[in-house]
Amino acid sequence: MAKNKNNQAIWNTRIKKNSSSLFQKVGNSLDIDKRLYKEDIKGSIVHVEMLFKQKIISFKIKNKIIYGLNKIEREISSKKFEFNKKYEDIHMNIEKRLFQIIGEEAGYVHTARSRNDQVITDFKLWLKSATKEINNLSLIHISEPTRRVF
């Protein structure tokens, strides 16, 4: 189960009873949403740039966060990143690793952005990319018969 910086399950701040193992399995989306890592990192970088432009964070903090996010992207791309199912999704895995790399400044990633904002942004970016890929594949299939005829 995903935990906050105080090592509590995210939902556990109000609910004191442990969830069933079935609930934990159903709530764990990591195996599905690993594919969103590029979008999650891209969305976080853009968000941090906005925080800097709005003078919410300093140039130094912005660069530190972006450095950490880029390092995580390289780790995932090179298959050196260790996903942990106890953090239940890609967002929490990346967040936990960012805290390990840069420390408390990682907490700024959620300034003025909810988890729902993060999830929907990731999904929209992924959908945009997947749509382009489908379009490109369909163009290849459409042009293939033409090449054979001429």
Protein language model regions, located:
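A helix-coil-helix interface module used to build multimeric assemblies
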Residues: 2-143, 147
